[in-house]
């Protein structure tokens, strides 16, 4: 997940997201992965508390630089038995991709 990369970025010198920025946005990078900024933590807390968890729609372009971390989160959701729908297609993290998948996601949300 992106949160794992952000936690690492805050620890690296000369990173595109220096530790000061990570601290300003997320708090202590050493505690980030165990914090409520991590969707995995939030999901597990909600599940353990017996809360009704939201259904999740995921769409990602196979050429998107975030494809790998999206696959990681997808596998996490599968392992947790989450109620989610996943699809991918040709595209990157651009409006060309989202113009196709946003309406599909909204339609899925309204039906589910």
Cite the ranges covered by each PLM segment.
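Non-catalytic cap/lid and distal C-terminal segments of serine-dependent acyl enzymes
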Residues: 1-112
């Amino acid at each position: 997940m992106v949160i794992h990369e952000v936690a690492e970025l805050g620890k690296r010198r000369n990173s595109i997201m220096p530790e000061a920025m990570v601290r300003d946005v997320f708090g202590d990078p050493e505690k980030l992965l165990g914090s409520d900024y991590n969707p995995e933590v939030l999901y597990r807390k909600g599940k353990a508390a017996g809360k009704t968890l939201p259904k999740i729609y995921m769409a990602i372009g196979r050429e998107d630089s975030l494809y790998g971390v999206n696959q990681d989160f997808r596998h996490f959701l599968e392992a947790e038995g989450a109620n989610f729908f996943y699809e991918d297609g040709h595209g990157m993290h651009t409006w060309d991709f989202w113009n196709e998948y946003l309406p599909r996601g909204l339609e899925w949300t309204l039906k589910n």
